């Protein structure tokens, strides 16, 4: 499985999960709770009684597109996108949640399955063809980031519309080592895999969570180690 870390504001995910009750999500972090109430204002004076409160929202998504399965994995509510590379020439991301899940952001792997006979693989590599493909994506991601552990990112709306990055400040992200906008739709995943992700995101995922595809959704590249070293 290969793909990206997709990140949304946690307040958006709360709203998608709870609707009008999203104002009842309280983490104890003043900045996070203020952001949640700004998105979900209420005139109700909420009780601090635990029965009146809701946990930070999470999600799980899955769809099949042709021969590929696309799904979210390791969803991290109130979390952070973190580096998971083992060499400076690679760029690999993962996700984590704090124990209190009180970050402004929520992230999850958004990956597509790749079979051992997939045309995207170089079959001349034999038994090492999947690992070779994984490493090639990680090296491409490092180049797109520009080095120094900077992560290449793209707004999900630009990815699905196949739009190049605009000259504007990089999007907000929990990734702490810096982000750089890139054309992930063109320069990272092979077209069949990118197209499958695009169809799942705009189809099944958007139907399940209206608002999943939006300017607030940011793809971080690349997620390659859900089931590989």
Regions found by a protein language model. Give the residues of each.
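Residues forming the flavin
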Residues: 1-229
